[in-house]
Amino acid sequence: MKLAFSVRMIPLLGFVLGGACQPGAPTGDRPDGVTVLVGTRPTVAEASLFPFDNHSIPFTQNVGLKLHPPRKHPGNPVLPRGPEGAPDEFGVQFYGSVVRHEGKFKLWYVAIGRDPFTVVEEDMMWTPRVDIIPLKWRAAYAESTDGIHWTRPALGLEEYDGSRDNNLVLMEPAPLGVINLKVIHDPEDPDPSRRFKMSLHTWWHEEGKKGLATLAPAVSGDGLRWRLAIPATPENGLLPKESTVIPTDHFEAAGGLYKWGGLFHASGQGARPVYAVDSWGRSVGTYRSPDFVRWEHTGTLSFSREGQHKKVPSGSGEESHEGISVWNRGNVLLGLYGVWHGSPDWRGRTVDLGFVVSNDGVHFREPLTDFIFIRRGEDHEWDQGGLIQGQGFENVGEETYIWYGAWDPGSLEPRGGVGLATLERDRLGSFSVRDDSIPAAFMTAAVEARGEATLWVNAEGVSEDATLRLELYDALERPLAGYSGEGAALLTESGLRVPVSWPEGNGIPGPEKPFKIKVSFEGEKVAGIRVYALYVGT
């Protein structure tokens, strides 16, 4: 049986006009009135409740949160630059995506050919200041059976340097220059020829003159042969200004792409005052579309760092680089963004990767402020200077894979590649006891299951001397008979996915009423327990 359930935020994420409403009360018990539907409550087959998501787990006692950075793979970069004459000989820029589909890991990235810049002027900050040649920056494809060893298939679709023996994907109606792209697979689209979707950071032109960064949406049936989703014909790799789908302000539009609440969201980098509340320097904005063709021109300031509300010279402060790449976990969005460390000189600027989370698909937050989740490499390493957040996240067996890229090294030298970072499955963050001499516990937001539910725990350090007591409460935090007190479940073993057994059975039966989960840390060796996730599903 497939279970559908949703995570409710209690108190409700909304405001009821015209009468009081008890949190968690059935809809039929509510008086007449108006409910403002702020936020989303997606119904999914299995929900993941993480310690760093303080909306899904808002209540704690004597527990501390820790984030766990992944380990870089010793064979990095797992996808290096191509050989001389290849369309990616200058750079493999993983402003791209990895999608697991039909038994393969499929990777899209920006291939940078030789001589991709023109020098505009000598400049103290840029040394020298350059402009991008759009047709030297193209969308390319690689694939793998294990996510570590990659091949570049000869697709024969696009010509480069007089040959079609390359891995460039087809982009119609004409080649389009891209500096950033993201790809998702959308199996819900009734049209099979549109089930792969790509957001492209390109540029518009006006009367042949290159303008500002903008968004171009593209669709494909196989992920290799793409067509623009809008009626537009690029010229010299640029989109006509009249064909733009979002406001023509500079917006680097392909930092992340995801579908949430029935809408497609394009996350990107902006640096101009286009939102009601703005920040200084690079910040994260989001635009939305119901069909991937018509994009709403009202946007959102989705994320900026705490220090960005103080004015500093452009590029010199702490900023948020290139949008948020998103791992859609069904009931919550996890993401990476560029932690920009500014400098008056371009060569002094560096970028690490930070970790964020969202429960509404619009606003993101850092569980720990300015925490560096993946750190740039040391001098002379392949990923020195800075990292870029490709949208590549997968659970593979007992590990979590996160793919990332190397940024501009601060010069006009060849750059890039795709790296892999790994950690134990879903162990991105944990709760542990702060003081083992006093009680420690946490409680989730309300979960509403339609049908019998099962609970699993991802934890380590659990034993007969270090246990987790799990109890269920209703939405008003009254203990549920048979699932609390003497009916509580006691977890005595560690693992990535340990099922919870209640005295009355493994399952949590209906009726379809919201319940909360309380987890208490107990035992002489309680200090060694780490809780990484709860899973509710079938």
Which residue stretches match the model-derived regions?
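Bacterial N-terminal signal peptides
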Residues: 8-19
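Carbohydrate-active catalytic/glycan-binding domains of CAZyme proteins
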Residues: 25-538
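N-terminal secretory signal peptides that target proteins for export/translocation
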Residues: 1-5
